[in-house]
Amino acid sequence: MQKKIYIKTFGCQMNEYDSDKMADVLNASDGLIKTDKAEDADVILLNTCSVREKAQEKVFSDLGRLRELKLLKPDLMIGVGGCVASQEGDAIIKRAPYVDLVFGPQTLHRLPEMLKQRRSTGRSQVDISFPEIEKFDHMPPAKVEGATAFVSIMEGCSKYCSYCVVPYTRGEEVSRRFDDVLTEVAGLEAQGVKEITLLGQNVNAYRGEMADGEIADFALLIEYIAEMEGIERIRYVTSHPKEFTQRLIDTYAKVPKLVDHLYLPAQHGSDRILAAMKRGYTSLEYKSILRRLRAVRPNISISSDFIVGFPGETDEDFEAMMKLIDDIGYDNSFSFIFSPRPGTPAANLADDTPHEVKLKRLQRLQAVIDQNTRRYSDEMVGSVQRILVEGPSKKDADELQGRTENNRVVNFSAGPNAAHLIGQMVNVNITQSHAYTLRGEIVVKQ
């Protein structure tokens, strides 16, 4: 019987990409196939996130449940990867001695050897080193199902924002070679992928070495990918305002395949708090980027991250953040109460704001963003949107589902025998808007 692997992914799209690579590596080396049921698996991997404390504690909660499964299946291999693994290392084994593997984001390509060592020695294996970009040299060619795919173009972050653990868990910024990225995208194009999302903690800091030794920036990478005929849409996450160059803005004017949606985390709107966060820009500089971008893409949708209750945040600071939100008119946003992460400078800052105050601020911020989201969705009713059909609707198998350029899910009926439309671009007339989705009808060519 073919052995199976179950992977649970926490956190960001980088982790989703890494989880796919874990499955690819272990399929190529050991023939493991993916399963959606942990109880059916021979290997279980938790790909973790340490950005917020809640996500970290979920991991140890899951490990507690897996302990019971291991008692029933002694040969079961349990591994912890990702940023919690990188941060905690051997401490995971001490807290949960039944864990067999602990590996960081940069060492997932070593999983086959780690499994082999665990089985031969009987000892838990830990490898949380930072061998720069080595892991991409050991990956089998990407295999995908569907019309969309992620491609990691760089690893790590060198910004060292005062609240963030990423530089400590994923290392400094290292870019993949230019031709390696293009080769991966071309391979995905050959499999029918129409939409590529370029991934990195700070994608617009990309500096990839070309075959002639020259260095390509992020804008050039986008331009080359856009030349691939089969790729119809290009997205990217996450970008940093400090690295958002005029060249990248000019690329929006030149490359129609670059979607009308930008995720550009502001984190706050108070210059005093932005300085304490070590973000490297002011609210005015942030707004200047979007003003120049909207000059070439007037209809671009903007989303962001916001941290509420950063240590020392006053009512005045919070109002500055609300003003930024009002000035920009965000389409949507991820927002959270500040979560101090061990080892970061912000974890040592005095914080005397009551939790109840932070919670009220968060609720107010989210209410405004939700109102914006609903307003933008309502304004789309009656328009015809170009949709990339991703598959059957999750709520009605007789309908299809796809996304607009501004990343809204659209459910629509396309009549009988419409499965051939999956993976295609179609025009859909938007007829209804809901909180987070749209409904529509396919536009039939006359």
Curated annotation (Swiss-Prot):
PROSITE patterns: MTTASE_N, MTTASE_RADICAL, RADICAL_SAM, TRAM. Its cofactor is [4Fe-4S] cluster. [4Fe-4S] cluster 2 binds at residues 157, 161, 164. The keyword Transferase applies. It comes from the Bacteria. One of its GO terms (cellular component) is cytosol. The keyword 4Fe-4S applies. Its EC number is 2.8.4.3. Binds 2 [4Fe-4S] clusters. One cluster is coordinated with 3 cysteines and an exchangeable S-adenosyl-L-methionine. GO terms for molecular function: 4 iron, 4 sulfur cluster binding; metal ion binding; N6-isopentenyladenosine methylthiotransferase activity. It is found in: Cytoplasm. It holds the Pfam family UPF0004. It catalyses: N(6)-dimethylallyladenosine(37) in tRNA + (sulfur carrier)-SH + AH2 + 2 S-adenosyl-L-methionine = 2-methylsulfanyl-N(6)-dimethylallyladenosine(37) in tRNA + (sulfur carrier)-H + 5'-deoxyadenosine + L-methionine + A + S-adenosyl-L-homocysteine + 2 H(+). [4Fe-4S] cluster 1 binds at residues 12, 49, 83. Its main location: cytoplasm. Signal peptide: none annotated. Coiled coil: none annotated. Belongs to the methylthiotransferase family. MiaB subfamily. Catalyzes the methylthiolation of N6-(dimethylallyl)adenosine (i(6)A), leading to the formation of 2-methylthio-N6-(dimethylallyl)adenosine (ms(2)i(6)A) at position 37 in tRNAs that read codons beginning with uridine. HAMAP family: tRNA_metthiotr_MiaB (MF_01864). Monomer. This is tRNA-2-methylthio-N(6)-dimethylallyladenosine synthase. It comes from Herminiimonas arsenicoxydans. The gene is miaB.
